[in-house]
Amino acid sequence: MSKPPSDLPRRPPAAFAYEDEAAEPGDNGRQQQGRRRPESFSEDIVLTPDEEDPFINPDRDPSAVAVATPRKRRTSFGKIALAAFGILLSLGIGLWTDRLIRDLFSRADWLGYAALGVLAIGILAVLALVIREAAGMMRLAAVQTIKAEAEAAILETRPAKARAVVSRLTTLLAANPETSKGRATLKATEGEVIDPPHLIALAERELLAPLDRKARALIVNASKRVSIVTAVSPRAIVDLLYVLYESVRLIRAMAELYGGRPGTLGMFRLLRDVLAHLAVTGSIAVGDSLVQQVLGHGLASKLSARLGEGVINGLMTARIGIAAMDLCRPLAFRAVKRPGIGDFIGDLTPSMSPRGNNP
């Protein structure tokens, strides 16, 4: 079968020149103007670090609470003066006690011996108190030592240091029944994991993940109590005192949960570190960022002003709990997600959370 003849004349073959310059008319103008002369610019070039670049780290939460770290202990003139006057006061009390006992002996021997017995009981009580406070400070120091050793062990190529860290962590949390299953898992897999980062991550998931869930429950309960008391209290001073009470109680519970069990002096040190962290990060006051977190969820149109203040104080208590969690936790957050302030908004305002909208 042949094609039917066509009436159109055939076009002879031809060659066409393809020029890129013809397709870009703007280039001709630039060529006519000539090249730009070299220039110098006085503005400084600011490079954004990779960890702060939102395009490199799209999952980074810009409103996340900064990680709290213990303050470095420095010797100051105030501490030296306080120690000097403390020694003078102790010497004065000693001289007064000596003169008192001598006067009692001069009056009657049994009064002098009774005073000596009371003095011995007081000295023993003070020694017991000093031992208890020293033990609490040592436990807090042990928590920070384990955290520092874990960070150093992750950079090692051999698992010896990582296994030593896991062993110390297991000993620290041995008295906590929440870690019994994790300790059994670590003992069953002993010697199987040889990579230090994976070994530290396994210990964090098995030992600290159950404690993290309990710590989150402590923060939520304390924040709810603060919110309720703030909403119903008639005076602002009552709010302030109750927030302080709940904060101290929450910090102590957090330290005991992670094996710290601080004494009175250790508790003051923890409280000072938490308050210093919040003051540095601007979280101790009700700032614009905290208000935006609440108002951004529609609370301005759905809650009263007093109840809104309760939610804000509850979120401030949650910030204190997160800071205490950072300070008291024996390992830094790596294998387990660190809680943020946004994780507690749904608990304080269930009507604003997705599950609260479901029938």
UniProtKB/Swiss-Prot annotation:
Sequence segments annotated as region (Disordered): 1-61
Pfam families referenced in this protein's UniProt entry, alphabetically: DUF697
InterPro entries: DUF697, UPF0283
This protein's record includes keyword DNA-binding: no
Keyword field: Cell inner membrane, Cell membrane, Membrane, Transmembrane, Transmembrane helix
Record localization: Cell inner membrane
Membrane topology (UniProt): Multi-pass membrane protein
Family, similarity comment: Belongs to the UPF0283 family.
PANTHER family, sorted: UPF0283 MEMBRANE PROTEIN YCJF
Protein name in UniProt: UPF0283 membrane protein RHE_CH02332
Lineage of the organism: Bacteria, Pseudomonadati, Pseudomonadota, Alphaproteobacteria, Hyphomicrobiales
